Amino acid sequence: MVLNRYALITNCNHKTLGLYYLWFSFLFGTYGFLLSVILRTELYSSSLRIIAQENVNLYNMIFTIHGIIMIFFNIMPGLFGGFGNYYLPILCGSSELAYPRINSISLLLQPIAFILVILSTAAEFGGGTGWTLYPPLSTSLMSLSPVAVDVIIIGLLVSGIASIMSSLNFVTTVLHLRAKGLSLGVLSVSTWSIIITSIMLLLTLPVLTGGVLMLLSDLHFNTLFFDPTFAGDPILYQHLFWFFGHPEVYILILPAFGVISHVISTNYCRSLFGNQSMILAMGCIAVLGSVVWVHHMYTTGLEVDTRAFFTSTTILISIPTGTKVFNWLCTYMSSNFGITHSSSLLCLLFICTFTFGGTTGVILGNGAIDIALHDTYYVIAHFHFVLSIGAIIALFTCVSFFQESFFGKTLRENTLIVLWSILFFIGVILTFLPMHFLGFNVMPRRIPDYPDALNGWNMICSIGSTMTLFGLLIFK
């Protein structure tokens, strides 16, 4: 595909914009990944290694930016923006998205939002609040630079506007521009994954927007929404944030489900086992995932019956998720092809890691167990197995499988991608599997130092991180 020098700001073609989303995703993701390598270098052994004692807030700033970038600027643009823009019109028989120019604007807002978030590092103390921006830390004028929190909030707002525009575009395209005679009931699992993701974004992003705007007004306009000294409530912010924050996890992983379903179905030359149940399972995941946000807040002093409700609802999500894994495996086992392409291997790796991450999620969903494991490395291990391994493998599966469609030629040979897959998989398993043991040893997250007794597991984690870096260099 030949592009002129102004194509980025003038092109409205959905395929071109989808490719730009992918390029932005890999560019931003590489930056975020290198930040995580800095964190693992610091945690290679106990005591401070590369961060000075008087500048320990730098560690907070790094993991804050790492989290925001990987969630909002790596996985979302790659799977939802890239795969959705490129293939949604094709899969529903449309020649173009409903609003091509709005689609172009939503792409251009992504690098603007990224630059705003990165600018927070230029402030004197940075915005070391964690990606959750919890008050009263984020509204404190003593330990942080208010301007750093400002630009992070504005960056998230700009990114949210871009996501809402894309979501409206996708839903309108499917409802009004699909091919004649193509009913909603016969749309593919991949198409439904993008539709359900778009609906979740439209329902939850306004709540996040309201929450961070209240935070901004607390910082600069003398409101007291989250200040307990004047009858404000910091827990209110947690409710507002996690009402978006937990569905966001499914917003990230549902397009990955669509990619994996499409690749498995195509590679094994058969329709998915239980095709309609796969769509129903995604709908159930979306509904249940939107009403379980309080499981992030078990330690905030909830009543017992509240904990019981959210524990049971959280564990209930494992039923539709298990349905999807079962159907994928049935489709694979009913085929005689075996692993014929690197994307088939990546799909199996996704299923393994996602299943393991989901199992640890069921453990953490239990209110009694979570009180012991809350804010330990067990939590980090859980969500990185689902996101850092699961969603990222789905992103690479997408590029590996569709590379001829995307670029008109095979950029990487099958053998090289298989080699990268194995090296990457071993690296991430070495990085995140020992974190479960660190969590059981109650190593707190977001702290750059730890007892000497935990040196061994942390050393293995850091070696795995380095191995993942080498694997990424092979794929480049």
Curated annotation (Swiss-Prot):
UniProt-annotated binding residues for Fe(II)-heme a: 66, 384
Keyword annotations of the record: Calcium, Copper, Electron transport, Heme, Iron, Magnesium, Membrane, Metal-binding, Mitochondrion, Mitochondrion inner membrane, Respiratory chain, Translocase, Transmembrane, Transmembrane helix, Transport
GO cellular component, as recorded: mitochondrial inner membrane
Membrane-topology annotation of the record: Multi-pass membrane protein
Entry note: cofactor: Binds 2 heme A groups non-covalently per subunit.
InterPro entries for the chain: Cyt_c_oxase-like_su1_dom, Cyt_c_oxase-like_su1_sf, Cyt_C_Oxase_1, Cyt_c_Oxase_su1_BS
GO function term, MF aspect, one: cytochrome-c oxidase activity
Pathway annotation: Energy metabolism; oxidative phosphorylation
Binding of Ca(2+), residues: 42, 448
Catalysed reaction equations from the record: 4 Fe(II)-[cytochrome c] + O2 + 8 H(+)(in) = 4 Fe(III)-[cytochrome c] + 2 H2O + 4 H(+)(out)
Crosslink (1'-histidyl-3'-tyrosine (His-Tyr)) position: 246-250
Residues the entry annotates as binding O2: 250
Bilayer-spanning residue ranges: 19-39, 61-81, 105-125, 144-164, 194-214, 240-260, 278-298, 309-329, 345-365, 379-399, 415-435, 455-475
Principal cellular location given in the protein's record: mitochondrion
Subunit: Component of the cytochrome c oxidase (complex IV, CIV), a multisubunit enzyme composed of a catalytic core of 3 subunits and several supernumerary subunits. The complex exists as a monomer or a dimer and forms supercomplexes (SCs) in the inner mitochondrial membrane with ubiquinol-cytochrome c oxidoreductase (cytochrome b-c1 complex, complex III, CIII).
Physiological role: Component of the cytochrome c oxidase, the last enzyme in the mitochondrial electron transport chain which drives oxidative phosphorylation. The respiratory chain contains 3 multisubunit complexes succinate dehydrogenase (complex II, CII), ubiquinol-cytochrome c oxidoreductase (cytochrome b-c1 complex, complex III, CIII) and cytochrome c oxidase (complex IV, CIV), that cooperate to transfer electrons derived from NADH and succinate to molecular oxygen, creating an electrochemical gradient over the inner membrane that drives transmembrane transport and the ATP synthase.
Family as reported in the entry's similarity comment: Belongs to the heme-copper respiratory oxidase family.
Protein name per the record: Cytochrome c oxidase subunit 1
Organism field: Plasmodium berghei
Gene expressing this chain: COI
